[in-house]
Amino acid sequence: MGCFGLIGTITSDHITVDDRSAIQGLGGILYQAAVLCGLGEDVHLFANCGEVSRHDVEETVAGWPTLRRDGLTFVPGPGNQVHLRYAERLKEREEVLESAVPPLDAAPVLARLPEFDALLMVFNSGFEFERAAWRRIVAGARCPIWLDVHSFVLARLLGAHRDYVAVPDWREWMAGVTYLQANRQEVASLRGHPERWPSAEEIAAFAGDAFAVGIRAVLVTIGKDGVLVLTGDGPRQVFAPAADRVVDTTGCGDVFAAATLRLLTRGVPLVEAATAGVVLASKAVGLAGIAETYRLARSARE
């Protein structure tokens, strides 16, 4: 059993697909927690969550014996209420964040940091940390860090559509992490051109910039086409098996990240680990929600 630190935000998701009301439920960092706990790993969760979601969260994770909740704090208010919209005409999902929780304190993470085999950080909202606090964690880590860009590249506002924005200071946030996960739209924002997706050559150039600040690998998720794995040895595409059906793609990248990082801590080579992660993620699109994701991981373990 490995020991993982998991940092992010628990969200309450309200999801529509092609303008039809579809799914409501918990989301955010609980997707990664569901996978790692379902696979039998020891997980220390660091997250702020709205008090109104306490019952739902505690009920959801009650049967996860390897989840350590000492870093989970319930704060007054509704927490992260997120409206997500998917449609065929959209290149990426649209997000409206109605409310948010305060940034996390680095101290509880730093206290546990020496115990971890790996640290997985997700910017579920983009409001998780002040930069100085996050940099203290990166500086103190002696284990691999996987960072998922996610909502870091969305405009920092509440109650309105969050546009993708350029983030010129991304190196100051991400330097020194081991694995950087982003999709093409997120890479576009980090490159300073959120208005268009990058070409293969531009993705490779971005990866070169990442390597220059100590990042060992860049993993660019490309939807049903799988993942681009970029290292100093060049790019490799890991193809995704065709999904039997598509119910909800919300947690697909989260499943990929958790499953891949788990194997990396066991010494599995990066491309092989990413291949297994993509396979599990392709199964995850056929279900919806945290509880079903946990059951999927349990079945993969068995």
Give residue ranges: language-model regions:
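Short pre-catalytic strand/loop immediately N-terminal to key active-site residues, enriched for Gly-Thr
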Residues: 19-24, 208, 239-250
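Short, conserved phosphate/pyrophosphate- and ester-handling motifs at nucleotide-, phospho-/glycolipid
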Residues: 36, 183, 253
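Short, electropositive alpha-helical surface patch
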Residues: 55-70, 141, 196-214, 234-244
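Structural detector of well-ordered beta-strand residues that form the stable sheet scaffold
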Residues: 145-148, 219
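Conserved phosphate/ATP/ADP-binding segment of small-molecule kinases
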Residues: 153-234
